[in-house]
Regions:
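N-terminal single-pass transmembrane signal-anchor helix
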Residues: 6-32
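Short, surface-exposed interaction loops/tails
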Residues: 75-83, 97, 107-149
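Aliphatic-rich helix starts adjacent to a transmembrane/signal segment
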Residues: 32-50
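Bacterial Sec-dependent N-terminal signal peptides
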Residues: 1-5
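Alpha-helix exit/C-cap motif
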Residues: 53-74
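N-terminal pilin/flagellin-like segments and related low-complexity appendage regions
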Residues: 61-65, 78-109
């Protein structure tokens, strides 16, 4: 009897392995996508928390000028400024020179649809920083005084 020297896999074995891999990818891909988006939302929340802390810290410095005096949404123009101003101190604390550089760090789908961080101050001088709608649901990320965790 003649011995053959067959090495490697047959076509049927390769097709079975590819089919199993396709099934695994089909099952695991949606979970992976959810995980990635959840991590992006978490990163955006960390960024908003940094903005909140920068605003609060700068507002407590009595030597800075341009600290918001009225409650409501603070325009992005107020968040631009030179050294010695509230807006300049906020940007300096965040390590950027323009407000657009802060907005460009947003990564989540929520942030990409609105692409702008909103800073709001209440009558007691407490800050709320959010992107999207002002809540912590699928349509917004909020930190600070107005966050309904």
């Amino acid at each position: 009897m003649k011995k053959t020297n067959n090495k490697g896999f047959s076509l049927v074995e390769l097709i079975i392995v590819i089919a199993i891999m396709a099934i695994l990818i089909g099952v695991l891909a949606p979970q992976y996508i959810k995980y990635v988006e959840k991590s992006r939302v978490s990163a955006d929340k960390d960024l908003l928390d940094s903005v909140y802390n920068a605003c609060t810290t700068a507002a407590s410095d009595p030597e800075l000028t341009g600290v918001p005096a009225t409650s409501g949404v603070i325009p992005a123009a107020s968040l631009a400024g030179s050294a010695g101003t509230w807006g300049g101190e906020v940007l300096s604390t965040l390590g950027v020179s323009q407000w657009s550089q802060v907005n460009s760090k947003l990564k989540s789908k929520i942030a990409k649809t609105t692409s702008s961080i909103v800073v709001e101050m209440d009558a007691q001088g407490n800050f709320t920083v959010y992107v999207g709608s002002k809540n912590n649901t699928s349509s917004g990320i909020t930190v600070g005084a107005g966050a309904n965790n």
